[in-house]
């Protein structure tokens, strides 16, 4: 049996500095033609930027999660081989996150994989909150005709969330405004 990631659940997900803890989760968007788009994302647990995301009409694989991790790393630090210091990577217990090759890759690039307690989605409340916000403020107003149309809108939605969407926890700044110290 594969070893499970260590768990944390200290009741607080947010941290006081960027690039200390990142969280990740996924969600599904149902299209009017019955197609489904599955999205996984990573958030910084301080500034709440959606640093990276992946989307597919199939299942979220461990390979897509490894791509997601690498994109987050490159978003924050440029083209580097690994994080300049260990960064916690908080996820639920989905198979794409707990797969041995995903956990090994995370460690190889300087991420410390941590999982929430089983049956405890509130343990990753920041990611859960992002999903609610994204579905309420973007998906609900988007063109959901088919998967191709939805996937074409995702870059604009994520960019708007990062550049414009205010957060009460960030004194009503957007994630990138907060990250830039504006």
Model-derived features: positions:
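Basic, flexible linker segments flanking DNA-binding modules
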Residues: 1-19, 120-121, 174-182
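C-terminal domain-tail junction helix/linker
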Residues: 14, 107-111, 132-182
């Amino acid at each position: 049996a594969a070893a499970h990631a260590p768990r944390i659940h200290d009741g607080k997900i947010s941290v006081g500095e960027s690039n200390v803890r990142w969280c990740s989760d996924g969600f599904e968007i149902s299209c009017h033609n019955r197609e489904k788009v599955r999205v996984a994302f990573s958030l910084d647990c301080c500034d709440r930027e959606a640093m990276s995301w992946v989307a597919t009409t199939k299942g979220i694989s461990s390979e897509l999660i490894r791509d997601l991790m690498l994109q987050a790393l490159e978003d924050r630090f440029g083209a580097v081989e690994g994080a300049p210091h260990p960064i916690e990577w908080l996820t639920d217990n989905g198979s794409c996150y707990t797969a041995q090759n995903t956990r090994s890759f995370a460690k190889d690039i300087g991420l410390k994989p941590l999982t929430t307690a089983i049956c405890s989605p509130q343990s990753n409340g920041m990611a859960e909150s992002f999903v609610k916000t994204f579905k309420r403020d973007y998906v609900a107003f988007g063109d959901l005709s088919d998967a191709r149309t939805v996937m074409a809108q995702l870059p604009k939605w994520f960019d708007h969330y990062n550049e414009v969407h205010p957060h009460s926890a960030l004194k009503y700044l957007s994630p990138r405004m907060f990250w830039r110290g504006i």
